Swiss-Prot record:
Disulfide bonds: none
The protein, known as: Phosphate acyltransferase
The protein's role, per its UniProt record: Catalyzes the reversible formation of acyl-phosphate (acyl-PO(4)) from acyl-[acyl-carrier-protein] (acyl-ACP). This enzyme utilizes acyl-ACP as fatty acyl donor, but not acyl-CoA.
Top-rank taxon, per record: Bacteria
Molecular function terms, GO-annotated: phosphate:acyl-[acyl carrier protein] acyltransferase activity
Localization: Cytoplasm
Keywords associated with the record: Cytoplasm, Lipid biosynthesis, Lipid metabolism, Phospholipid biosynthesis, Phospholipid metabolism, Transferase
Classification via Gene3D superfamilies: Isopropylmalate Dehydrogenase
Top EC class for this record: transferase
Origin organism lineage: Bacteria, Pseudomonadati, Pseudomonadota, Gammaproteobacteria, Oceanospirillales
Amino acid sequence: MPVVTLAVDAMGGDHGLSVTVPAVAAMLSRHEHMHIILVGQLEPLTSALSQANIADHPRITVQPATEVVAMDDPVAVALRQKKDSSMRVAINMVKEGRAQAAVSAGNTGALMAVSRFVLKTLPGVDRPAICTAIPTANGHCHMLDLGANVDSEPAHLLQFALMGQAVVRAVDGVEHPRVALLNIGEEDIKGNEQIKEAAGLLREAQGLNYVGFVEGNGIFSGEADVVVCDGFVGNVSLKTMEGVAKMIGNMLRQEIKQSWLRKLCGLFALPVLIGLKKRMDPDHYNGASLVGLRGVVVKSHGGTSKEGFACALEVAQLEARRNVPSLISDALGQPGTH
């Protein structure tokens, strides 16, 4: 198996080095054919590597960067002022061919803007999108756009559908993914004109297994492998899912603590509860792809744990090995990036 190299923004996110370095250590122990370039401010980064006992790891390279994009930095600051940020340097490495993918837990808007500026979009892509896996009753689906584009034209939704199909084929091995449009109803008469026009485009697209509209509750029942929506709807949906999952976990804990009998029942049900938590845990599905770019870029949730960041690294290495940008180019009928 060939070695895949990931460029990691070690400083990004709410927790920075305390999450990224342990996650990298875990990934290197799982994957023999992986090299990590850790990008960040030299002194704190080398200190974190020493604390994790991986300072001399043969498959880790340290790339200095003098600046960090803060979670509340405006996009313009990240793009025009912080040109030596750990985020920017990591993405530059993909452009230069020194890495096959970049991973960051930093500011989403900044990451999309910098990635688009440095890597550019693939031929035929008007707007990149954010795509991630969502848990369902029988596995998971992929949903896009999750916030890159607040407003999207019908033609953009068609591009999202084609890109999502390419991602699912690559990472899940589903040859003919079921593609659906997220709508307020399943009937053809439901929805605004934008959605209705997009439905017509998806229905006529050759090679696209379009199965119609899906409602919000249909996302989780496994009715589709790819769920397409604009970034406003997608981001609200994603945050709602995360909030509901967190609420259910908190409610279960509160109910179990009500009495000793409930605590005893909770103890017997522990294996079931652990399995349920794993299936619903946002960290387990951490790692959103910025699709439509001339390179693989994966966004980790800013507040994720080391386990969650490791999941984002898994997504990046898989998409890099499958050369997802090239597959997206093929899906759009454009020359690929090989």
